[in-house]
Structure formats: C-alpha cells, structure tokens
From Swiss-Prot:
Upregulating conditions: Expression is induced by fluconazole and repressed by CAP2/HAP43.
Classification via InterPro entries: YJL171C/Tos1_C, YJL171C/Tos1_N
Glycan attachment points: 118, 128, 170, 210, 244, 262, 318
Species whose genome carries this gene: Candida albicans (strain SC5314 / ATCC MYA-2876)
Annotated protein name in UniProt: Probable circularly permuted 1,3-beta-glucanase PGA52
Keywords tagged on the record: Cell membrane, Cell wall biogenesis/degradation, Glycoprotein, Glycosidase, GPI-anchor, Hydrolase, Lipoprotein, Membrane, Signal
Annotated catalysed reactions: Hydrolysis of (1->3)-beta-D-glucosidic linkages in (1->3)-beta-D-glucans
Molecular function (Gene Ontology), one example: hydrolase activity, acting on glycosyl bonds
Gene it is expressed from: PGA52
Enzyme nomenclature, EC number: 3.2.1.39
Pfam families in the cross-refs: YJL171C_Tos1_C, YJL171C_Tos1_N
Enzyme class, broadest EC rank: hydrolase
Record's function text: Probable circularly permuted 1,3-beta-glucanase involved in cell wall modification through beta-1,3-glucan network alterations such as increased branching or remodeling.
Length: 384
C-alpha cells in the first residue's frame, strides 16, 4: 500500500480524546483504488459439503467514495424502533457548499402512516446453511418473523437485542450469475437491488431504548446499530466464517453509521468504515475518534450523506426533515446546528491488498491506532 496522508483532526478542539462526545462526524478523502473478491459459485448450500468459490479475477474499484459508491443495503439491530427512513441521491452535493446539488428522494418509509415507497424489508428467518448461515426472507410486520411476501414494518415496532432487519430497494434482481446485475446470490432468497449512487444520503428517525426484554447473556446485548453493507454481502452470507462466501473480508465495503460497539459504552454511538483505506485490519476498521450520545428515552433524527468530493458526514439533529426534495443548504445547516463535530481524513491508498480473514462481530471496542494515538499526544503536548 501507498499511504500519502493520514491525519486525524477536530473542527472544534485541537486536543481530541477518543471518547469525545459530538453530534456530527466527518470522514474526508473517502474513496480509493483497490480490489475485492466476488463470489462466483455457491455449491450444495444445504449439505455438509457446502462450499463457495470466488472469481479468480478480483473486482477492481476506484474513485470518490469507493467502494461505498456501489449499491448498499441498510441494516438495523435492536433494541431499536424505526419511525422513518429515506434514501436520496444528488448530482453534485458538496458538504459545506450551499449552492451545490440538491437531494432527490428515492425511497421512503413512515411507520405512523404505513407509507412505503421503494423499500423492501427483509430479515434472517430463512433456512440455515453450514457455510452461509441463515438466509434472508421477507420480514413480517414485526421486522423479524418470516413473511410470504413484501410487508411493511408496523408502527412503533421494537426489535430487541441481537434482532436485525434490513432494507433494500423494491427493484428485484435478475437471475443469479456472476456477470448479472446482482451477481451470485442464494437461489431461495427474495433478492433485491440495494441503494445506488456515489453521492447518496440516508435519513433516519429512530429510538434506541434501553434493553429490558432479553437476557444479558445474549449476543450484542443492548448494542443497537444502524449500518450499511455492500449489497452483495447479505445476498450471499452476512455472517459466514468462510472467507469465500462473501466479499466482506476482502473489502467490498461497510459503513457503520450509528453503532454501540460494546455493552460498557452503551450510551456511545460510533461511526466506523470497514474497508482497507488506511487500515489493514478490516474488523477494527477506521473509526472516528468520537461518539454521538445515544438517547435512551427520546427520538433521534439524523443520517449520513456521502458527497461528490469524498466527504461522508454523520449527524443527529432535530431539524432533519424527510422532504421529497432537500436543498444542499438544508443538509449543511443540519450538520452545523448539530454543534460540536470531529473530522477524520482517510489515507490516500493505491494498490490495496486484501489478505485478512477476520470477521466483523459484536462487542468490539474502538481502539485508536498507534499513529492516531501518537498524533493526539503530540497535539496535546503542543497545546500545553
């Protein structure tokens, strides 16, 4: 790899601790040139001989926000109530520039009215495979049970710890195949396209109440999250131990928007990028050195915007609206009104090599890299 820059800085304080509370997080210089391994074949998926093969030629990517410029699915883990969701695209939005491109809404869900536009709710309630794990099905109105057809999430639906559902678009995939529109996927799942766009935005109105319904022994206890995955991942295997059953480990892209990462920091929502831009440890990823406070009793509104210049901005703000068209100035004002924020500039990377076999799992605490700690120490001493 070639690292031409690595800088961690704050917009409000020079000496920023890893546990600083903020209401907006910015990643700059997002996107790099690299490759990932795409699944080419799934064999005997419900037998002990289940296996997966990747194509011998890795998929190449480059450009602004890559590989997160590809289609993504939107994932939710409890304890969580989703009130509203919307996805947007823009021709040229640039963070901080009020005259840049406006946002056009492509998808919308509102629980109170039962509105559902270009969204499909899926959940892991399908058949179990020894190498792929549990397959996707349509989600019932409770978000976690199996349904026979596409169903809208019911108003005020609470999912508990370790329960998950995912939102795709309502555009069905064509036939499974390496060179087809959705690539290879499990033949018995409802397969849909994710949300496209280099310049895209996702908005959420949600609650993350304290867990009161499940045992503390359960995985991901009281650790809610909202995150994005390259849409190829859940269509094959989201939680497989076989490196060839998903493109995740080879770096096709994950963005954790709001994630409680361990039960001791259950009030802290972190934002993390999991690919190989500036890190060779995809499980730990590149986390912003700050957190957004989780509100246990109220409703939170916010989102993430990927702009046309390689900035990804995460925020919470009560001013967030879900209009069919949103001006650039509105998004900029939401972030500005959020108050204290932190910025992380990612390394410029070329010649990415994916060799790790680690897997994302719950309960991983954010640990700053050696370089980040060194920079923070130097900056703190400079201030003193």
């Amino acid at each position: 790899m070639l690292f031409s820059s690595l800088l961690v800085s704050t917009l409000v304080s020079v000496a920023t601790a890893a546990n600083q509370e903020v209401e907006a997080i910015q990643f700059s210089n997002l996107g790099f040139s690299g490759t990932y391994n795409q699944v080419e074949k799934l064999s005997n998926i419900y037998k002990d001989s289940c296996s997966c093969e990747v194509n011998k030629t890795p998929v190449s990517f480059s450009g602004t926000n890559a590989p997160l410029n590809e289609e993504v699915s939107v994932h939710f883990r409890g304890p969580l109530v989703l009130n509203k969701f919307a996805s947007y695209v823009s021709d040229g939005f640039k963070y901080g520039d009020d005259s840049s491109g406006d946002w056009k809404r492509l998808s919308y869900y509102e629980g109170s009215s039962g509105t559902s536009e270009n969204v499909t709710f899926l959940t892991s309630a399908g058949k179990n495979s020894s190498c792929l794990g549990i397959g996707l099905t349509y989600a019932g109105t409770d978000g976690i049970s199996k349904a026979d057809s596409s169903t809208v999430l019911a108003k005020n639906t609470l999912i508990n710890s370790n329960d998950e559902f995912v939102i795709f678009s309502n555009i069905s995939c064509g036939k499974s195949g390496y060179n087809n529109d959705c690539g290879v996927y499990r033949s018995d799942i409802p397969a849909y396209h994710g949300f496209y766009g280099t310049t895209k935005m996702f908005l959420f109105e949600f609650q993350m109440p304290n867990e009161t319904h499940t045992s503390t022994d359960i995985s991901n206890y009281n650790m809610p999250a909202i995150w994005l995955l390259n849409a190829h991942i859940p269509r094959t295997a989201q939680y497989s131990m076989n490196v060839n059953c998903s493109c995740w480990r080879s770096g096709c892209g994950e963005f954790d928007i709001f994630e409680v990462m361990n039960s001791t920091e259950y009030l802290h929502m972190y934002s993390t990028i999991h690919d190989y831009q500036g890190s060779d440890d995809i499980q730990t990823g590149m986390a912003a050195p700050a957190y957004i406070e989780r509100d246990l009793t109220g409703t939170m509104s916010g989102g993430v915007a990927f702009d046309s210049s390689g900035n990804a901005v995460v925020w919470v703000s009560n001013s967030t609206s879900f209009d069919s068209t949103i001006q650039a100035s509105s998004v900029n004002s939401w972030v500005k009104q959020a108050g204290a924020d932190v910025a992380t500039t990612l390394a410029t990377v070329t010649g990415q090599s994916a060799t790790t076999t680690s897997k994302k799992s719950g309960g991983v605490s954010y640990q700053p890299s050696f370089i980040t700690n060194l920079l923070m120490t130097v900056l703190t001493l400079w201030v003193i």
